[in-house]
């Protein structure tokens, strides 16, 4: 990688996605503009920057872009840069006062601020109202920023964004360090302890190596434990067991190249930030990050408290029976036995879980339950789902207002160990659909947000993929044995003789004795090319018979001959053949990305 340098002044931001920014700078001498990208792009105007980075060329246009590695403010001895630097947060000195300082000391102003700030007090602040207080605040912030400038220049070279550096700097006072530089020098793995800062442990190791920090230090091992547990949580695990091939000790040993004894020694100190629980049944220990333990235990406690409350029945059994007779007659339907059982369960229990596979009638049951709640006067209901798509399907299926959990309680779960919600829930019944996609953290926030609610109805398919976040909440609630569960097991959506659902259930049970007929077939081919040709030809036949919107092709991959890219290209050539080697075909969706 060849490092190049530019001098430039920020002009405008043209794109951002999270920390990543694309901005336009211009050379103050030639006025030539150039593009800068990165996670630490400075955006203060009228300040001259010394920019270091890698120059890359965009393949299609040949346009060159500077991928920023580091920068520093230069020419602070020039009036405009000096005034703007003092006006930037967190110093925030009035521009008129900054201009006055520069007029008095000219190019010596920086040296005076660093080495003889008393002159600044005597000439600027002494005569001002509350001058002593304003001076102490200003000069204190100046000194902190000068120290931070050196530390920032050091850290950005390791790929740590300015945004993360600001978070680290805010955490310094909490950890009782004098400044960020002192914190990093004392413990390079301090970075791993700060909420919302996601840095790979290898980066901390590089910094530690530069500072000659010992490889087997307790702080490094604690950081390694945290790193391993965070990765485990991204894979859905709330905790790891201490011992075993997949245990925490083994994972930390592999990640850090340390011994089991060294990891065990740190664990025996019961380090801050971790919760260790003895699992007598497995003769092992569960190791949690403290905030993950709070979610799990807190959620269990909330549910226990809710189950312990005395809740009046919506209707007694006779009233439910009468309601079901009227409801089925009015709507011209017949509810299956388990669907009726779900209605009875909701009438009697504070929390009910309704589960079942695709096509078993969960939505039909939910509509009957909502009608029963309306008939009993419990019509102030809150309908939620885990995702936007799920809430939209809920609206279409019930004809009622529904929204996502996040939007309902206005929760912020951006940082892994910090969370908040702004809105409480008050309703007669809370109905949560697609609950299998709700992780432990969001479920905990949801139950914390409940102010008043007579009933909770949880709907979901336990066989679906679990949530992206940590925890398998729906499955755990069902297996707890403390909550009323109704499992719908009669397929309503498919024909009785269709093997599709039956074979899907066999797959879930890891069985392979599938039932084949015209609705479920296995076609054997000699190679991928033959398979792709068969798929495309069959697709063309079916679309002519049923229409394009009625036929779908699913492929487990993007690339290769039977991947989605190749299959889509083959189908496009069949449906809309190119007449003149045209790039676009009839029906293609086009978006204009540049105005010229």
Give short role names for the model-derived ranges.
Residues 16-220:
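Long, highly charged, low-complexity intrinsically disordered interaction regions
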Residues 213, 231-234, 244-258, 329-331:
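Short helix-coil junctions and helix-kink-helix linkers
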Residues 239, 340-343, 347-517:
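ASCE P-loop NTPase helicase motor core
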Residues 320-350:
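Conserved pre-motif I regulatory segment
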């Amino acid at each position: 990688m060849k490092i190049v340098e530019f001098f430039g002044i920020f002009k405008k931001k043209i794109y951002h996605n999270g920390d990543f920014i694309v901005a336009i700078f211009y050379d103050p001498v030639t006025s030539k503009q150039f593009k800068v990208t990165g996670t630490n792009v400075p955006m203060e105007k009228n300040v001259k920057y010394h920019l270091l980075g890698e120059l890359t060329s965009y393949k299609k246009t040949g346009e060159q872009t500077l991928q920023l590695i580091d920068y520093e403010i230069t020419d602070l001895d020039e009036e405009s840069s000096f005034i703007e630097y003092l006006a930037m947060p967190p110093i925030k000195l009035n521009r008129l006062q900054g201009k006055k300082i520069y007029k008095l000391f000219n190019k010596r102003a920086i040296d005076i601020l660093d080495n003889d700030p008393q002159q600044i007090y005597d000439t600027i602040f002494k005569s001002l109202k509350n001058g002593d207080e304003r001076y102490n605040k200003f000069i204190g912030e100046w000194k902190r920023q000068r120290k931070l400038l050196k530390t920032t220049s050091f850290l950005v070279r390791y790929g740590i964004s300015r945004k993360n550096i600001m978070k680290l700097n805010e955490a310094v006072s909490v950890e009782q360090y004098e400044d960020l530089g002192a914190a990093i020098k004392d413990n390079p793995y301090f970075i791993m302890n700060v909420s919302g800062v996601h840095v790979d442990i290898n980066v901390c190791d590089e910094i530690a190596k530069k500072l000659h920090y010992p490889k087997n230090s307790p702080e490094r091992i604690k950081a390694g434990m945290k790193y391993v547990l965070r990765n485990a949580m991204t894979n859905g695990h709330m905790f790891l067991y201490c011992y075993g091939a997949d245990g925490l000790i083994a994972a930390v040993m592999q990640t850090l190249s340390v011994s089991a004894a060294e990891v065990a020694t740190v664990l025996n100190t019961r380090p801050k930030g971790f919760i260790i629980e003895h699992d007598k049944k497995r003769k092992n220990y569960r190791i949690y990050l403290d905030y993950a333990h709070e979610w799990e235990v807190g959620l269990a406690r909330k549910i226990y408290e809710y189950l312990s409350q005395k809740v009046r029945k919506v209707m007694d059994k006779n009233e439910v029976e009468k309601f079901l007779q009227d409801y089925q007659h009015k709507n011209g339907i017949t509810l299956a036995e388990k669907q009726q059982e779900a209605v009875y369960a909701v009438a009697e229990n504070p929390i009910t879980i309704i589960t079942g596979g695709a096509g078993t009638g969960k939505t039909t049951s939910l509509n009957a339950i909502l009608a029963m709640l309306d008939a009993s006067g419990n019509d102030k209901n809150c309908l939620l789902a885990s995702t936007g798509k799920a809430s939209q399907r809920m609206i279409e299926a019930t004809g009622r207002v529904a929204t996502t959990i996040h939007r309902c309680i206005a929760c912020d779960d951006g940082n892994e160990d910090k969370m908040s919600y702004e809105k409480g829930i008050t309703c007669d019944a809370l109905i949560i659909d697609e609950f299998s996609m709700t992780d432990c953290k969001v479920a905990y926030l949801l139950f914390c947000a409940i102010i008043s609610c007579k009933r909770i109805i949880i709907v979901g398919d336990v066989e679906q993929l679990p949530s992206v976040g940590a925890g398998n909440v729906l499955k755990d609630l069902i297996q707890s044995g403390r909550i009323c569960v109704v499992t719908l097991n009669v397929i309503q959506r498919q024909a009785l003789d269709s093997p599709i659902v039956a074979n899907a259930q066999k797959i879930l049970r890891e069985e392979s004795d599938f039932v084949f007929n015209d609705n479920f077939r296995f076609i054997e081919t000699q190679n991928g090319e033959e398979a792709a040709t068969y798929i495309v030809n069959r697709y063309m036949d079916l679309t002519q018979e049923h229409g394009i919107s009625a036929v779908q092709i699913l492929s487990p991959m993007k690339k290769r001959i039977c991947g989605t890219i190749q299959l889509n290209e083959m189908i496009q050539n069949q449906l809309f053949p190119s007449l003149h080697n045209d790039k676009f075909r009839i029906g293609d969706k086009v978006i204009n990305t540049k105005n010229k």
